[in-house]
Amino acid sequence: MKIGIIVAMKKELALLTPLLDNHELKTIDGQTFSLGMMGKHDVVAMQCGIGKVNAAIGALTLINHFRPELIINTGVAGGANANVNVMDLVVGVQVTYHDVWCGPESTWGAVQGLPLYYEGDQRLIKMLPQRPDIKQGLITSGDQFIDRIEKINEIQSKFPQVLAVDMESGAIAQTCELRHTPFLSMRVISDSPGASHNNTQQYNNFWEEAPEHTFALLHQLITSL
């Protein structure tokens, strides 16, 4: 199987590429792709950049040039639920936007003509180990770093079931929906807005201590396919 993996940031990619065997680089349209193997599967990994536009462009370039059978978006996210802690892994059974509204008679979070919720790939979800640090549920995306409890409260008012917030999953999920490519978002919680007086510092501390096993579950799932 050919699998695409998308991260947003250079420091996320630096934790991911050591997991690739026979690693080589390929540049297309100014974007660099890391090609290699995980177990018996061909993997194409890339850093798309932060935000929804970068994420969509990266996902579409990956799909058009490499035709993956599955795309996984991974990296860090902010916790958005009292039951989610820093270093937990949140798997997006569903993904939506928290900052999209197309006007009266539309549903908050839905792009007109498209689903409100994008569904995660059930094959991988069913393979997840039962561990207290692995949470399954809703991830919401928007073009802002969530740093205040007021913002979390606003998101929760529209999506009470939300577990995590990020800036890319929704755009990648939408691109995969339009290009008929299975998708899953798997995020490591780096900070918890509202749980700390300074979640920006909490986020920075996470990266100072970011363990090599941050992407261990991703590697485990892919090699088990």
Feature-to-residue mapping (PLM):
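Mid-sequence, gly/pro-rich, charge-dense loop/helix-turn segments that line enzyme active sites
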Residues: 80-159
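Short glycine-/acidic-enriched loop or helix-start segments at secondary-structure transitions
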Residues: 15-17, 56, 81-84, 100-101, ...
